[in-house]
UniProtKB/Swiss-Prot annotation:
UniProt cross-references to PANTHER family, sorted A to Z: BIFUNCTIONAL PROTEIN GLMU, NUCLEOTIDYL TRANSFERASE
Keyword hit for Magnesium: yes
Record note on cofactor: Binds 1 Mg(2+) ion per subunit.
Pfam families given in the database record: NTP_transf_3
Region Disordered, annotated ranges: 470-493
Organism (species): Clavibacter sepedonicus (Clavibacter michiganensis subsp. sepedonicus)
Family: In the N-terminal section; belongs to the N-acetylglucosamine-1-phosphate uridyltransferase family. In the C-terminal section; belongs to the transferase hexapeptide repeat family.
Region feature (Linker): 247-267
Protein name: Bifunctional protein GlmU
Assembly, per entry: Homotrimer.
Sequence segments annotated as region (Pyrophosphorylase): 1-246
Known EC number: 2.7.7.23, 2.3.1.157
Length: 493
């Protein structure tokens, strides 16, 4: 068969096992972080592969690990608690990795084994379903994906006969000049019948310069045994693009982000500048959301219908309500209510909850705070470890002093409270419903409902202080001249 793979969205089948190869060292990444754990659109590379295996509906998912084992296992176990973990032994090679991987499968498993690489993040479940379907319909022993590349350098070439049938995989180092001109390459995605795979792996040796057990040798073993092999090209080579260095990681991130953005645009989201907008795979946006330039919507953030986010805004695992506006803001693990406004230059730290029609304005930092519906923190304030009721107003420059050097304490502000400018609320303290505080007040004691809390002494003007304390200075001379001069017109008003 020489036609391209038809991605037709075959239904899930529980008779599928997936083996994910995540044992490689990834030296070309030049990183302390294992290659398969490098982040891409909010998930590690291997996380994308695990998610695809889950969507495929595989009955068993096996991850083969070796280098930086503990780090990889921690992440895999968190993302896919039911995944089976198998350690590759000292025998290197992809063939050996699969050989140890299938030992985790039940002895009686007779379905299909799909082999994936942990560094191929864009491959989707629809493509795999179609690959498995083609494998079953043709009753193949092995069906593999291929891709046609403008630059196939470094990849194993697919050799076909005159009739277009698959004949072999030839690695670059073994290819003739004519074979090197072939642009169809092995994509490293395979479907085996379980029993055929078990028999084949036992026949693969390590008679090569690297003394490795190569999975690609399985094709030769099956062919010599008279088995059926089919190689199906994918229409979209990005689906099988592997990540080996940071250049490829950036290219994959750009491509995946473009696909994510296009999907949301087709779903009714306005994105003004896709080049400067980044959206993670787990983020969710409703129709009629507007995303302005320079915006990142990360993690499991959700943005409800009619909301506007940006410009220059970062949301991490943050919920934005309907018709809310969030501009030039950094928010993490926050909840922003419907029709609320945030920004510009606001910093919403974890635990911030802003009620419907509330406001967090310019140069405001919040943390672990619940702000009720219609309440406002308009500007230049720090509000931490606090509860603010509904329809209250926090004056400019307010500081909620929540830390005594040892422990954090909470501040409670009731409904319809008006805090004066430059207040310091020293927690723990309560400001009662309907109360006011004077400008510049340092509130250390509870303010009863309906009261006015003040802590600033009455103003006293010390006439002549500048001349007495700073004689001969320009300020003193100017003060004397002003005192001796004509009265200010404003004083007669």
């Amino acid at each position: 068969m020489t036609g391209e793979l038809d991605v037709d969205g075959e239904p899930r089948s529980p008779s599928i096992a997936v083996v994910i190869l995540a044992a490689g060292q990834g030296t070309r990444m030049r990183s302390r972080l294992p290659k398969v754990l490098h982040p891409l659109a909010g998930l590690p590379l291997v996380g994308h592969v695990l998610a695809t295996a889950e969507e495929l509906g595989a009955r068993h998912v096996v991850t083969v690990v070796r280098h930086d084992r503990d780090q990889v296992v921690d992440v895999v176990s968190r993302l896919a608690p039911d995944a089976l973990i198998v350690d590759q032994d000292e025998i290197p090679g992809t063939g050996r990795a699969v050989e140890v991987g299938i030992t985790a499968l039940p002895d009686g498993f007779t379905g299909q084994v799909v082999v994936l690489s942990g560094d191929v993040p864009l491959l989707d479940a629809a493509t795999l379903r179609s690959l498995v379907s083609a494998h079953r319909q043709a009753r193949n022993d092995l069906t593999l994906l291929t891709a046609r590349l403008d630059d196939p350098t470094g990849n194993g070439r697919i050799i076909r006969g005159q009739d277009g049938a698959f004949e072999a995989i030839v690695e670059q180092k073994d290819a003739t000049g004519e074979q090197l001109r072939i642009d169809e390459v092995n994509a490293g995605v395979y479907v085996f019948d379980a029993e055929a795979l078990r028999q084949t792996l036992g026949a693969i040796g390590t008679d090569n310069a690297q003394r490795e057990k190569y999975l690609t040798d399985a094709a030769d073993v099956i062919r010599r045994a008279g088995g059926s092999i089919e190689a199906l090209p994918v229409r979209d080579s990005w689906l099988v693009a592997g990540i080996n260095d940071r250049v490829q990681l950036t290219a994959a991130a750009t491509e995946l982000n473009a696909r994510i953005i296009r999907r949301w645009q087709l779903a009714g989201v306005t994105i003004h500048d896709p080049r400067t907008t980044w959206i993670d795979v787990k983020a969710t946006l409703a129709a009629d959301v507007t995303v302005l330039p320079g915006t990142q919507i990360l993690g499991a953030s959700t943005v409800a219908a009619g909301a506007t986010v940006g410009p220059d805004t970062t949301l991490r695992d943050t919920e934005v309500g309907e018709d809310a506006t969030v501009r030039r803001t950094d928010a993490e693990l926050a909840v922003i209510g419907a029709r609320a406004t945030v920004g510009p230059f606001s910093f919403l730290r974890p635990g911030t909850r802003l009620g419907d029609e509330g406001k967090i304005g310019a140069y405001v930092e919040t943390k672990n705070v619940e702000i009720g519906a219609g309440s406002k923190v308009p500007h230049l304030s720090y509000v931490g470890d606090a509860t603010i009721g509904e329809h209250s107003n926090v004056g400019a420059g307010a500081v909620f002093a929540n830390y005594d050097g040892v422990s954090k304490h909470r501040t409670e502000v009731g409904d319809h409270v008006h805090l004066g400018s430059r207040n310091v609320l020293v927690a723990p303290v309560r400001i009662g419903t309907g109360s006011y505080t004077g400008a510049g007040a340092v509130i250390r004691k509870d303010v009863p409902p309906g009261a006015l809390g003040i802590s600033v002494a009455p103003q006293r003007n010390m006439v002549g202080w500048t001349e007495a304390k700073r004689p001969g200075t320009p300020e003193a001379r100017a003060a004397v001249e002003a005192a001796d001069g004509p009265a200010d017109d404003a004083s007669d008003a």
